[in-house]
Design a protein with these regions (language model features):
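Active-site cores that bind ATP or allylic diphosphates and position pyrophosphate for catalysis
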Residues: 2-138, 143-152, 158
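A conserved active-site cap/scaffold subdomain adjacent to cofactor or substrate pockets
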Residues: 154, 158-179
């Protein structure tokens, strides 16, 4: 499937009130169809979630214990097959993160709550690679005055910026400790 076709499919799912996910419509292509498509472009690699769940005997509902929020669960059917390596042969960030965490012997991942949904895909990757996952803690996001997510891309969210604005280090630590 082309990126345009996939985006159209996701948009249709959103309009229907469904969670956008890969439907698998290009999964069952014949070898001839695959060869034709490869002449036009490189395919992305996806994890076949249904096959992985079946192969590993995983439950239909994935659960992980978040160190802050407690048990969080998600039905595997809501996840759908997801890209692991993009068509340019670059791994997606959460696949690279799983490998990186393993190589660096990471035991705890502390990140924003906007990454909770990624965690389920990562847990499937840990299982597929037979790697023990680290513990996860998802913290509330720090928001800008306009309630948008604070972002390093927009500036003003680095310690250096706070220091330039005159904030004392103790005040920043105190603020973060009280979140």
């Amino acid at each position: 499937c082309t990126p345009k076709e996939l985006e159209k499919e996701r948009e249709e799912m959103r309009k229907a009130g469904l969670l956008p996910r890969y439907s698998g419509r290009c999964k069952g292509l014949s070898e001839d169809e695959k060869k034709k498509m490869r002449k036009k472009r490189q395919p992305a690699w996806r994890l076949d979630v249904e096959k992985e769940v079946e192969k590993r005997g995983l439950p239909e509902v994935l659960v992980f214990n978040d160190l802050i929020r407690g048990g969080i669960k998600k039905d595997v059917k809501e996840i759908g097959d997801f890209v692991v390596v993009k068509s340019d042969q670059m791994p997606v960030f959460f696949f690279a993160g799983v490998v990186d965490d393993y190589l660096m012997k990471i035991t705890h991942v502390i990140r924003g709550e906007d990454h909770i949904t990624n965690t389920f895909s990562q847990l499937l990757l840990y299982k597929a690679l037979s790697i023990k996952p680290p513990q996860f803690a998802h913290i509330p996001l720090i928001l800008e005055k306009d309630r948008s997510k604070m972002s390093k891309r927009r500036g003003g969210s680095q310690v250096f910026d706070l220091r330039q604005k005159g904030y004392l280090p103790q005040a920043v630590v105190n603020f973060l400790a009280r979140l």
